[in-house]
Amino acid sequence: MLKIFTKLFGSKHDKDIKKIQPTIERINEIFSSLSSLSDDELRLKTASLKDRIQSALAETEQKRNDLEQKLDNPELDLNQADNINQELDTLDTQFEEKTAAILEEILPETFAIVKETCRRLKGLEYNVVGHSMTWDMVPYDVQLIGGVVLHSGKISEMATGEGKTLVSTLPAFLNALTGRGVHIVTVNDYLAQRDREWMKPVFDFHGLKTGVILTSMKPQERREQYLCDITYGTNNEFGFDYLRDNMAGAPADLVQRPFYYAIVDEVDSVLIDEARTPLIISGPVPHSNTDKFIEIQPWIERLVKSQQNLVAGYLTDAEKALKNKADDFDAGLALLRVKRGQPKNKRFIKVLSQTGIARLIQNVENEYLKDNASRMQEVDDELFYSVDEKTGTIDLTDKGRDFLSQLSKQDSDIFLVPDVGAEIAIIEAEKTLSAEEKIKRKDDIYRLFSERSERLHNISQLLKAYSLFDRDSEYVVQNGQVMIVDEFTGRILPGRRYSDGLHQAIEAKENVKIEGETQTLATITIQNYFRLYKKLGGMTGTAETESSEFFEIYSLDVVVIPTNKPIQRHDLNDFVFKTRREKYTAIIGKIIELQEKGQPVLVGTASVEVSETLSRMLRAKKIRHSVLNAKQHEQEAEIVAHAGEKGAVTIATNMAGRGTDIKLGQGVRESGGLFILGSERHESRRIDRQLRGRAGRQGDPGESIFYVSLEDNLMRLFGSERVISVMDRLGHEEGDIIEHPMVTKSIERAQKKVEEQNFAIRKRLLEYDDVLNQQREVIYKRRRNALIKERLTADIFDLLHDHATKVIEKYHPNADVDGLEEQVLRELSVEFKIESDEFEKNSVEENADKLFQTAIAFYKRKEEMVPSNIMRQIERYAVLSVIDQKWREHLREIDSVKEGINLRAYGQKDPLLEYKQEAYRLFVELLREIELETLSLAFKLFPVTPEAQEQIEERQKMSQVRKERLVAKHEESQGALNAAAAQRAERPSSSDPAAEKAGTTAQPVKAEQTPGRNDPCPCGSGKKYKNCCGR
């Protein structure tokens, strides 16, 4: 049906291209008129375009500057400042709209100028990352289309070899004319430096400056690079610089400009594959729990060995039952227990590939999953712990708890977490207890909950380390360090660590030094970092399969750009084998066959382990080959670039060498072009498409095929029932190959299932981070304001106004003048005197105004005593030091909440709603503490002597964590993923009102507590109270 509608009305892609076509015709029309101009006349065209942009924006910019000058007036009252800020917001929106309009107007002429510049550069010889290069590129029409798409804030899907690097110069050039800076984001330092040097002549011709951000650069160098018109760099470097800027102690320490426009190369790799790993800057913590891992590691090792022995027994029983043709159900139950107890057991994986076994296990599992999985406990109770490989969760059983209690010589109750809510309710109901006794008992419950939760968490992480994480697959051990291997590229990720104690658990398992715990000082997810840009565009060869995620998360539409020449690559149906051994033997046979006829072959693998296995088999056959895993980017690009030569054999991880074209050597076209041989299907269809896309560039011939076995992870965990049933019906024997379009489609359906699951996890992670992101925006905005503003007096008086009202509201009902005067003196060092009669007679507003005026008079006297520059330092120090200290503490508390939040799913509560409530409560508390301590510090600091001034400077130094001890890392987030997995497994049905109610119970709000003007509005809008319901 869909095909019929597409034929009648045209596909979305056809419509997208048709809409852009008139613009392309206009570009080419202008381009044909530029050849008669001299070089200087062409450069004058660019200068003229800059002038047009400035003229279109001049009026709005002047209004904005005037309003910003008004804001600096210390005599402004609070309402006037709020009104100006609202006007500025309106002007900012108008400014962006006018910018978009003028750029759209000049786009055809600008693109034509870039195209003409490329034509004039033809034959230019220059160096690119140490290699001699000759410019031979002039944008084709399809590349112009790609440029228009990028400028529109969309994703341009262009096949490998279509010249995406050149395409990026078109929108980068256009948007750089605004003077606001353009960021071009790549996946590694090598590509950033290569692309900048490669495209530099185009920008240099017109006087536009290009820069590059590299890992090794110092802050001063980075600042200079960010001031360039176009800056290349990796997503990590851009993101970490953003976080470091929000820890800066002075305006001179800032390196980045406000975010305007970013073009993300390999956008799927950056925005999807990296999306589960937040950027984190961390510092050391005084106390670490590494000893606890060392203490319990021997217990867990014995527990795991006991489970392995138990599983081996079940496996033997099952094999005997199957051999003797005994009761199939008993055999299936034994195998199900093996699957739940040790899913990666190699003997089990072999048995699983036998005819009918997978179906038998599935039938038995379905029986126990009936009635909302109420009987699954019968399966797990015989094990020490159960493993769900799909969701990555592990549950300790009663049998496991008893085993650990015997090893630790402690009661098994120490492995049970108390129900805090129920215990508190019992304490509250106990009428014989005094208030002090109740408080003590509650404290004991909270302490017990904390201790046992942490112990269970450490046990769970160690069990994961032993059961789900394999050496030389998920990680490698080098020089006594556990290093993560990227699941997509097979490269080692130095400096990256698993979160939530998992990395320490793996270190304990491997008996290497356990690194101390770190404290998060600043963090942001990739998704929320790229949302900071006013406009975002992206390029890749494979985005269409993830188009829904791009649109839902980033509001990015995907436009598929036609190729310049038709694709000649022939994609063959998958070959399916029963075992990995058969598959590897077939791969080696195919490589020998291809090499004999001189056809180059690129073998794509999903892990380091597989690439090394194939390499050993090739060495045994004395076949010359290259292997790519965990190499430097420069070597990688070099090897991949030569992979198209006659007879070349290259083994590489599926995404190795992205961004580097494989050009065919002499005589290779005649032998069929590059042959792509995938050693297994990846979880994502997109990764497979990327591997196929290495062949058939720019109309070159090529072939691609995937060899799959039933023992591959994808087939084992998510394998289609149809594939298994087909192989069973055909009586598949060892060595047989199945090849049919239906089988290939079934495998793709299994991949789609995994993609949907992974998207749900990434989306859930983002939902968690969105909570923190709203808080981060508020804190960073306050901090940046304090850092850049010349005078903070108005802000401090704003806080004072709120505080005066709150303090008066506290003491007015009981007319407690003594308490009021004592608190004001203690917090602000202000002597406030008021008669009791007057205090009672006045309204809250009148008393608050009197306190406000008294405090202002005190502050102004202080300003007369202290030099102006010292006073400004005091104000800035008061705001920055308090924000930094309190934000660090808040992040630590948020991490603690996130670690255990998934457990609430077992109580039929939505962990996300619970997390939002906890995070909001903590944030309201954070803002109150920041405001009070900032106010207190600003009023109480009196550096009236040189000694006092030295003390302030010393405290400023002490408040900044020493930079050499900070660690910038891209951390593998586990806590929120586990919460998402638990939520997926345990989330109550949306049709269950009781469950919904349990998940959304709000904290009671006291009616007499009026929110402060700067507090978050209780309505949940995310705005300040004064800008929302408090107007």
Swiss-Prot record:
Segments of skewed composition (Basic and acidic residues): 963-973
Chain residues that bind Zn(2+): 1017, 1019, 1028-1029
Gene3D superfamilies for the chain: Helical scaffold and wing domains of SecA, P-loop containing nucleotide triphosphate hydrolases, SecA, preprotein cross-linking domain
Locations listed in the record: Cell inner membrane; Cytoplasm
Residue span of region Disordered: 963-1031
Residues the entry annotates as binding ATP: 143, 161-165, 661
Assigned protein family: Belongs to the SecA family.
NCBIfam families recorded: secA
UniProt-recorded name of the protein: Protein translocase subunit SecA
Organism: Prosthecochloris aestuarii (strain DSM 271 / SK 413)
